[in-house]
Amino acid sequence: MENIIEINYNQTGKSKKTNEYGMREMQARAFEKRNSQYLLVKAPPASGKSRALMFIGLDKLINQGLRKVIVAVPERSIGSSFKNTDLKSYGFFENWKVDPRNNLTVGGDNSKVKSFVRFMESDDQVLICTHSTLRFAFEKIDDKAFDNCLLAIDEFHHVSADVNSRLGELLRSIIHNSSAHIVAMTGSYFRGDSVPILLPEDEELFDKVTYSYYEQLDGYEYLKGFGIGYHFYQGQYTSAINEVLDTNKKTIVHIPNVNSGESTKDKYDEVGKILDMIGEVEYQDDDTGIIYVKRHSDGKTLKIADLVDDQVGRENVVAYLRNIEALDDLDIIIALGMAKEGFDWPFCEHTLTVGYRGSLTEIVQIIGRCTRDSYNKTYAQFTNLIAMPDAKDEVVTYTVNTMLKAISASLLMEQVLTPDFKFKRRRNESEKSSTTGELFVKGLKEPSTENVKKIIENDINDLKAKIMQDSQVQKTFSGEVDPKVLNKVLIPKVIQKVYPNLSDEEIEEVRQHVVLDTVMKGAKSEVVGSKEFIRMADKFINIEDLDINLIDSINPFQKAFEVLSKELNSPVLKLIQETIDAKRINFDEDELVFIWPKV
């Protein structure tokens, strides 16, 4: 299997080093904005968001005069990230302390809401609870009770601007009816796959701190590289998984949801078949729930955690996973809905996911499981096992669409896993470009309004997500559509849909930056003599000759076509093309006028 994406990192150690206050690079960046009333922190898994919140929360209590800090997490297990922490020994002015009575993520569900209400009426300062407890407690207390308090929402992508989202409604109510401060934290670079997290007018209130995935991984000590690959199968995935499951690597296997097309509809049988493929089950430990399997190839005993079986013993398995310390404590995890968000197994080298995942946030979370820095690995891998279209298959259109969506998701991941560029319009020949600094581009329109500037600086990845998930755009992955039609017709259409208030001039400015950024992040840099060249699609270009017209002649999704061509045989490619052709791209009259000279 050849990877569609390969990224190398420089092991600078920067993201792990701490300053005189004991803060890592991301935490120090967030702490600089500690006085903001509303703060949105976007940073990848394992970058230290929990501790960043501790620093900010303590400053708000001690130096800014706030009364309380309330931390809401999506599930109980994540509450342990906010346990008592010694910060003073590393240079900070106070330790993070939580009274056991106020950690509502421990134990059963009895009287959690009562405990929350008691906390709000007491002089206690710090409380940890789940999103669910926060929602139910909110119904019992007035918005004004949150005056002069900090409400921190971890895994903020769970919030939604949808009118039916109770967490979203709660947040809007607190913003508009109290003097509360809010810190929102997320490891996802995409607001949501259809509904935004916040209404635009609410989002404008937030100061933003972004720490990129590239900064995080490039600043690691051990990790040198990361790859994203696809493997296509026909029939049932359980008969093909052995082709991509390397049992020498510490691996998390995510099997498909029982409602998905890839599922056999019997999740327990699927786990059984995977175990049989690996080896012979020797026994299951009564205390821990861990399954001991004697590997077929060499007789080595592997320790495997089954998180799919949701019977009584799963709590024991979860408890075992929480206390893993040694490399040999575990070899493989098989999971369905678990081992994603907030789950920590630094030794994991490979995440193998069966079937397409509709949520980009979920893909970010899954990838985050294998990209932790650890002494046992220099390379991490995400593999997606996807059904190959079959002409005899009744759901061939569904399979083709699923494949295109999966490939678009990995192209999006490449956009956040590679370094960011700074683009400027080339005004004279003496300006020198560099892929590690500024890139000068002939004919590039620079932002003419504050609105465009904000979109380019803060929302470009969200916009790319909308573009790549657009069904019309995905039809261009087969390589049959002229790049200029994609870049100058289809992409502006999506921009206009997402930002209906932009003028034509503003749309063009945003379009140029989106296309340019997408093309450059998929390009490879090569130095020949004293000159730097960029290889993009089938072109090899001197970095000083970058021109917006040249960029517009390149399909930014060329890689999608390349992966399809390499991994699939001719009959399957023909089938994909025919399926796409059956659903032609629709153009209005103005668009046809633009396209006509090319036909």
Curated annotation (Swiss-Prot):
Family: Belongs to the helicase family.
Domain Helicase C-terminal: 236-408
Lineage: Bacteria, Bacillati, Bacillota, Bacilli, Bacillales
Gene3D superfamilies per the UniProt record, alphabetical: P-loop containing nucleotide triphosphate hydrolases
Alphabetical list of Pfam families matching this protein: DEAD
Residues holding ATP: 43-50
Molecular function via GO: ATP binding; helicase activity; hydrolase activity; nucleic acid binding
Protein's recorded name: Putative ATP-dependent helicase YeeB
Residues covered by the Helicase ATP-binding domain: 30-207
Keyword vocabulary terms for this entry: ATP-binding, Helicase, Hydrolase, Nucleotide-binding
Signal sequence region: none
Key word Chloroplast present: no
SMART domains per UniProt: DEXDc
Top-level class of the enzyme under EC nomenclature: hydrolase
Residue span of motif DEAH box: 154-157
Top-level taxon in the UniProt lineage: Bacteria
Source organism: Bacillus subtilis (strain 168)
